[in-house]
Every structure is written in C-alpha cells, then in structure tokens.
A protein has these predicted regions:
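Conserved DEDDh/DEDDy metal-dependent 3′-5′ exonuclease domain
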Residues: 30-37, 46-50, 62-158, 162-177, ...
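Short linear motifs in intrinsically disordered
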Residues: 10-12, 59-65
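Two-metal-ion RNase H-like nuclease active-site motif
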Residues: 50-58
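N-terminal accessory regions of nucleic-acid-interacting proteins
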Residues: 1-51, 115, 119, 130, ...
Length: 198
C-alpha cells in the first residue's frame, strides 16, 4: 500500500445464500486454447508482472483413483490462455513461468502445485494463494466463489467443475468456465491492491 492510499472497507464474510443472490459474472475477453507450441503465449505472458492462475483435472468418481492434470489457465488483462496438458507432460515453457518472478495468483494453490509436481519436479516461485491472503486479512469467507462475491460483487459459476477436461475438444462452456476462474483470481488481487489491502 502506498502512503497516499486509504483502505476501502471490505466485508469479511458472506453466506452461500447471499452469493447465490448475486448476478453471474464471467470472463468476456479473448480466450486462446493451445495444445502445444506455448512459446508465443509466454512471450506475451512474460510482459506482465501479475497473472491469474488455475488448473483443471478430469474428475474421478472411483475411490483411490487420481487423474492427471489436463489444463493450466493463465490470465493477463483482457486475455486468458488455456494450456492443454496431454499425457501428463508439462512443457518447459510452463516450468519457466512457474519458477519465474511473475506473480501467479490463484485459490487453493497447494493442490495445484502438488498435482503439477506429480508430473514434473520444479521449484514454484511467486505463487499467491488468495485463501491465505484472505486469512491474513481476517476475511472469514474463502474459496473463489465467496472471494469473487466479496471483492467483485458477482457470482462465479461452478457448473463445469466436474466436466471432462480431457475431451478432445473443450466445449464453449468449459472454455468460459476455465477462463473465468483464472481471470477472477487476477481481478480479486487487483481489487485488493486497489482498495489498499496489498
């Protein structure tokens, strides 16, 4: 927080019922889906010091079964890259990004990092977990839906959360859902900075 900034008070808690009363919000910018050749995407991503970050894994409904990560989402202003991960292979460009000084803002990042380390050993750097930030700020409501509601004033849909992220082609709804999650993380971080909390 700069010396001239004044904190704008933020509600510290919101109920599930209050969240459900809010209008749905979603990312309306450009969505770029890539299956390989990630280098050009990171030329663009590397121009930014703060990015939104999320991952998706095909859900499993059998006890003890664990699927590999299928998608990594990186948000920059006005654009979200959806990086498809096939056969558990994380591209070297992604590793460079994960180990870089670029801030990567997400929610529940320990699970994301653990899933990525199952595929490839790396040293994560500059990862900012909004759940941990919320705890430090005394915000009782955590998770993307509640933090988006508190900070951004809209409801994030989770309708595609349990869809198949290994589909040959992602549906329009999947793309929008995945992009919205990463974008919302970036927007929450920016809003907290704007209000003088970071």
């Amino acid at each position: 927080m700069t010396p001239n900034q004044t904190k704008v008070m933020l509600n510290k808690e919101i109920t599930k019922e209050e969240v459900n009363e809010l209008e749905l919000g979603s990312f309306s910018g450009k969505i770029v889906v890539l299956t390989n050749e990630f280098q050009n995407a990171f030329y663009e991503i590397n121009d930014y010091s703060i990015t939104g970050f999320d991952t998706e894994t095909r859900p499993n409904f059998k006890k003890g079964q664990k699927n590999k990560m299928a998608l990594i989402q990186v948000a920059i202003p006005g654009k979200v890259f959806l990086l498809r991960i096939y056969k558990g292979d994380i591209d070297q460009e992604i590793i460079k990004y994960l180990e870089s000084d670029i801030i990567k803002v997400g929610v529940g990042l320990n699970d994301d990092i653990s899933s990525m380390k199952d595929l490839r050993i790396f040293s994560p750097n500059a990862m900012v977990d909004l759940n941990k930030v919320a705890i430090e700020l005394g915000i009782k409501s955590q998770g993307l839906r509640k933090l988006a509601a508190l900070c951004l004033g809209f409801r994030v849909s989770k309708s595609q959360q349990t869809s198949n992220w290994e589909n040959h082609q992602l549906t329009k709804a999947q793309k929008r859902y995945a992009a919205t999650d990463a974008w919302a993380c970036l927007e929450i971080y920016n809003k907290l900075m704007e209000r003088g909390y970071l």
